[in-house]
UniProtKB/Swiss-Prot annotation:
Protein name: Multiple inositol polyphosphate phosphatase 1
SUPFAM superfamilies, sorted: Phosphoglycerate mutase-like
Molecular functions (GO terms): 3-phytase activity; 4-phytase activity; acid phosphatase activity; bisphosphoglycerate 3-phosphatase activity; inositol bisphosphate phosphatase activity; inositol pentakisphosphate phosphatase activity; inositol trisphosphate phosphatase activity; inositol-1,3,4,5,6-pentakisphosphate 3-phosphatase activity
Lineage: Eukaryota, Metazoa, Chordata, Craniata, Vertebrata
Signal sequence region: 1-30
Residues of the active site: H89
GO biological process, one term: intracellular monoatomic cation homeostasis
Organism listed in the record: Pongo abelii (Sumatran orangutan)
Reaction catalyzed: 1D-myo-inositol hexakisphosphate + H2O = 1D-myo-inositol 1,2,4,5,6-pentakisphosphate + phosphate; 1D-myo-inositol 1,2,4,5,6-pentakisphosphate + H2O = 1D-myo-inositol 1,2,5,6-tetrakisphosphate + phosphate; 1D-myo-inositol 1,2,5,6-tetrakisphosphate + H2O = 1D-myo-inositol 1,2,6-trisphosphate + phosphate; 1D-myo-inositol 1,2,6-trisphosphate + H2O = 1D-myo-inositol 1,2-bisphosphate + phosphate
Broad class of enzyme this protein falls into: hydrolase
Key words, A-Z: Cell membrane, Endoplasmic reticulum, Glycoprotein, Hydrolase, Membrane, Secreted, Signal
Superkingdom field: Eukaryota
Listed EC numbers: 3.1.3.62, 3.1.3.80
Amino acid sequence: MLRASGCLLRTSVAPAAALAAALFSSLARCSLLEPRDLVASSLSPYFGTKTRYEDVNPLLLSGPEAPWRDPELLEGSCTPVQLVALIRHGTRYPTAKQIRKLRQLHGLLQARGSRDGGAGSTGSRDLGAALADWPLWYADWMDGQLVEKGRQDMRQLALRLASLFPALFSRENYGRLRLITSSKHRCMDSSAAFLQGLWQHYHPGLPPPDVADMEFGPPTVNDKLMRFFDHCEKFLTEVEKNATALYHVEAFKTGPEMQNILKKVAATLQVPVNDLNADLLQVAFFTCSFDLAIKGVKSPWCDVFDIDDAKVLEYLNDLKQYWKRGYGYTINSRSSCTLFQDIFRHLDKAVEQKQRSQPISSPVILQFGHAETLLPLLSLMGYFKDKEPLTAYNYKEQMHRKFRSGLIVPYASNLIFVLYHCENAKTPKEQFRVQMLLNEKVLPLAYSQETVSFYEDLRNHYKDILQSCQTSEECELARANSTSDEL
C-alpha cells in the first residue's frame, strides 16, 4: 500500500487483469493524473532486465489472461505434441544490495534537505525535497524475492499457455507435467504460482490449494541446469570474479554520456556532483522501475530522468548483460550447453515415442530460471547478435542494436520450443517440425529467419553444440596461460 497526496493506492494486490484500469482510476481519484505522470510509461521501454512483461506485450494490459495467437503458429494437420519452456521468474523486489544503495542516496537527499530546508532557488518545493520525503518502503528482507505482481505474472502466463495449447495442457496430461526450478525463492515461488494458474484453468472459480497438496507435487530443484553459470569454473574465474572482465561497463560509467547525466542530476537535485556516481544514478533509475512494476505507481524518481537519459542508462545495463551473459566472452554462452542439450533430449525422446506410437511421457516441461539463464542460451543459438560488439565507446553507433535486454528478457520472459507432428507429411523428415516462441511471439530461426523448421534440420544446424560442447571441458580452466577471448 502506498500513500500519495493523502490517498491510498491499493495496487500491489489488485488483479493484473485490471492493472491499467485500476491504476488510472486510483490516480484520477487522487487528483494525480497530470501530464508528468506519463513519464513512467515513456521511460518503461528502457528499464532493461527490470522491464515489466506487459511493456513488451502491451496487449496484456487489456486482457492479461486471454491468449494472443501469433498468426505464424502452425495449425491444421500439424498437432503440437510437446512443449519445452524456459521461463524467467516474475516481478521481484530489489536485491538487498540495491536497497542499500537506494538508502544511501535517500540519506544524501535528506541531509541536503536539512541544510537548506528543502527549498529550491525560487523558494518553491523542489524535486530533491520531494524525493527526500518520498516513503522509502524497501527493506533488506525483500532481497530479490517474488512480489504479488510476480505471482500474477506466472498465474496469467499459465492461463494463456493452457488456452493456447489446450491439448498439451489437458487435464489428462496434468499428472505428466515436469517442472524444474532454480533454488532461488523467486523461481520456486514462480513455479508454484504457475501451477496455481493451471489449477485455475482446470477448476475455474475454485481457490487453488497449496502446491504441496496438489496431485502433481512440488517442482524439482536443479541448479546445474537453471544456474549453470554457478557451476562453471571458467566463467566464475574469467568473468564473474575477474575485476577487468567488465571493463567496458566501468569505462562507460566515467564516459561523457554518463557524466553529462551525472552533472544534470546533481543540478536538479541540488547536491554536490562529487556525492553522486553512476551506481547511484542507476539505482535511482531502477527505483522508478520497481515502483512502477511492483505497485503500479509513478514515483518522483521517474522525474529525475528524461528519455535521453533513460537510453543511456539502458545501454549501461545492456553493456553489463552483453559482457557478462551475452556475446562479450565465449564462455558466457558455452556454459549453457548443458541446458541446450537437455532441451533437445526432451525433444528427441518425444520424437522417438511418437515414431513408436507410444504416448509422450512428458508433453510439457517447464523450467524456471533467471535472465542469466535465458540470455546465454539465446546467445549460444545466435540470437540478437550485432555486427559490432557493444563497447564503452560506440553508444551512438549502437542506438539501433539488436541486443536490448529489456525486449529480450523482461520479468516473466519465456523461450518456448513447440514440437509438432504433421499427419500429411510426404516424408518421415517432414513429420516433425519445431517452432520457437520468445515472450509468446514466434521467434524466427536465427540462421534463416523462417518461422518453422523440420526438427531434423534444426538439430543438424546445432549439431556442433549438441555433440561437441561438453560442459566439463568448456568450463575447465586452461592449464597454461592463454589469451583472452574478448571480442
